[in-house]
A protein has these predicted regions:
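Short secondary-structure boundary micro-motifs
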Residues: 6, 14-15, 43-46, 103-105, ...
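A cross-kingdom signal targeting lumenal/periplasmic-facing segments of multi-pass membrane
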Residues: 48-184, 188, 192-204
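Short extracytoplasmic
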Residues: 18-50
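Alpha-helical transmembrane signal-anchor/signal-peptide segments
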Residues: 4-23
Length: 207
């Protein structure tokens, strides 16, 4: 039996991605707020992330009510086992946060259901509920088994998929309120970008 070694990078066959222009600086009731920067990692961790991802984007948005949402997006052209996505659970732990209440869930959008993970990161008085998802190629998947399965599907065709990790978080002691605000933000963001960009950011809905 011949073993297929994935060599064709899907990223090389797709349009070049630019996270800075892909996600608008203002959309719906949201605009960039430069007063708060999303979680920054130490230089050693950043060097590791630079090996995994081709591009990263970190922004904070604020709405007219003064509510803030932090957005972090990372794009990698090679999402094989060699360069698996760096999960937020690991990032936050490395920065001294306690990570708890990790739950797999679904986020209903106007385009379909998005599989997400939710978790709570706590450091001192900082209570940061987080929603994130991963894409492998054109499909949003939960990290772990589903992620490996999607990588395998590409691997069987000799292809190496690209992928995204999208993290949305808020500093809020009320987790329910935080997740509701994050859901609204995500829905607004998906509405503000084109079909091609939405597929890259959140996968093909219904696939």
């Amino acid at each position: 039996t011949k073993i297929v070694t994935p060599t064709i990078k899907v990223a090389d066959q797709r349009d070049i991605i630019n996270l800075e222009t892909m996600i608008p600086s203002a959309f719906g009731d949201w605009k960039i707020d430069n007063s708060i920067v999303p979680l920054q990692v130490d230089p050693q961790t950043q060097a590791k992330l630079d090996r995994i991802y081709n591009q990263t984007l970190a922004r904070t948005y604020m709405n007219s009510l003064g509510q803030r949402v932090m957005l972090s997006v990372a794009y990698g052209g090679d999402q094989s086992d060699n360069l698996a996505v760096h999960k937020p659970e690991v990032c936050y732990l490395s920065q001294g946060f306690a990570v708890m209440k990790i739950v797999a869930g679904e986020l209903l959008t106007q385009y379909g259901i998005l599989p997400v993970k939710r978790l709570l990161a706590v450091q001192g008085n900082r209570n940061e509920p987080i929603t994130y998802w991963i894409t492998v190629g054109d499909k949003a998947v939960l990290p772990g088994f589903e992620q490996k399965l999607q990588q395998l599907r590409y691997g069987l065709t000799g292809s190496v998929p690209d992928g995204m990790l999208v993290r949305v978080s808020t500093i809020n002691p009320d987790e329910g309120d935080a997740y509701r605000l994050q859901a609204l933000f995500i829905q607004d963001m998906l509405s503000a970008i084109g079909v091609k960009e939405r597929t890259r950011l959140a996968g093909t809905f219904g696939a």
